[in-house]
Amino acid sequence: MTEQVRWIDVLPLGELWEGDLAGFDLEGEQLLVVHHLDGSVRAFQGMCPHQEVLLEDGDWNEESGVLVCSGHRWEFDLFTGDGINPDDCRLKEYPVRIDQDRILVGLEAYEKEIDADPVR
């Protein structure tokens, strides 16, 4: 199987202000979209890897980029997805692109490879 990306239109860029974040359910996957103060936009898994608490409910410091999960206070760097406390975990990151002032997030799509010379 080969992996491809399907781009999903999430929302207009102007609806997610710099220094803000929002959670979304995209085709059954919880995502967290972050619009940093420097203008960059990132997307990560929206559930804490510890106990599947929604990260959008956590405490976010938009200046440092650190999000603290409301469940058990796990901390994540929302510039990189790296775990801070504990530091042995990481949030899955999704590709993001801006197209005509709209935020698009890439979800994985799988397509079956066709064997050019099938065995009979």
Locate each region found by the language model.
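Short amphipathic
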Residues: 5-13
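Basic/polar N-terminal segments that are highly enriched at the extreme N-terminus
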Residues: 1-3
